[in-house]
């Protein structure tokens, strides 16, 4: 599958690629990383992972590639995959990148993908680099990516109703901390700006981001866990 997708990328170099085609291809490659496992991964997954591992992640080739694809996809979707709800604030599917990277790779990988994804978004948008929002997105990615800490093992096909509730609470708390506290504070420190507009953007971001990450994110996590559980069972039978 991955060879077909990479071949498609090479073919696109010879023609004009629409934003929809680019985003669709990005999601396919990204989700493929969630189900791909190298030989020996099954034995590794059977070992009890430490909380530290679920927070920091395992920075192997799979994680690095997943974070890189996630950051690129985040940057594209922040500009082309959303609906404007406030000044420079959108209801966007880019927020699902936090969910997938966090579920598959851990909290710090999700934070890194969100940080660099926002930097890429600023570069594509051409409105300058806003470090305050990049750090805010990294904080949110960290909260969202804590799934493994409370027992959600997406790679092993484990995601329960109780874990979904905990996830939803952390999404709300993470958005509130990231955009209600961290981003406004950094806006004032870095840019000495009046915070009225920033607080309006923060409120819109909290509501829109949490909505996407809960309403779409929870079914997506169940779907990924179910698919990985099926893949795990097939490999065990082999």
Model-derived segments and their meaning:
Residues 28-238:
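Loop-helix junctions at membrane interfaces
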Residues 1, 10-12, 33:
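Methionine residue identity
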Residues 5, 21-31:
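N-terminal amphipathic/hydrophobic targeting modules at extreme N-termini
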Residues 13-14, 88:
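Intrinsic-disorder/low-complexity loop/linker signature
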């Amino acid at each position: 599958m991955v060879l077909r997708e990479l071949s498609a990328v090479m073919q696109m170099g010879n023609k004009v690629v629409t934003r929809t085609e680019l985003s669709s291809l990005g999601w396919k490659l990204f989700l493929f990383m969630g189900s791909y496992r190298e030989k020996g991964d099954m034995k590794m997954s059977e070992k009890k992972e430490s909380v530290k591992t679920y927070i920091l992640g395992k920075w192997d080739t799979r994680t690095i590639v997943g974070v890189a694809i996630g950051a690129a996809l985040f940057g594209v979707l922040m500009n082309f995959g959303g609906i404007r709800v406030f000044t420079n604030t959108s209801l966007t599917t880019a927020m699902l990148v936090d969910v997938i990277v966090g579920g598959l790779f851990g909290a710090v990988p999700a934070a890194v993908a969100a940080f660099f994804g926002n930097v890429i978004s600023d570069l594509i948008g051409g409105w300058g680099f806003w470090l305050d929002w990049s750090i805010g997105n990294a904080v949110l990615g960290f909260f969202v990516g804590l799934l493994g800490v409370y027992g959600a093992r997406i790679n092993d096909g484990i995601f329960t109703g109780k874990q979904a509730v905990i996830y939803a609470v952390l999404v709300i708390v993470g958005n509130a901390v990231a955009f209600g506290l961290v981003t406004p504070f950094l806006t004032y420190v870095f840019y000495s700006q009046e915070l009225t507009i920033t607080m309006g953007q923060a409120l819109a971001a909290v509501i829109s981001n949490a909505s996407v990450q809960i309403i779409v994110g929870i079914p997506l996590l169940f779907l990924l866990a179910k698919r990985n559980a099926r893949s795990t069972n097939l490999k065990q039978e082999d």
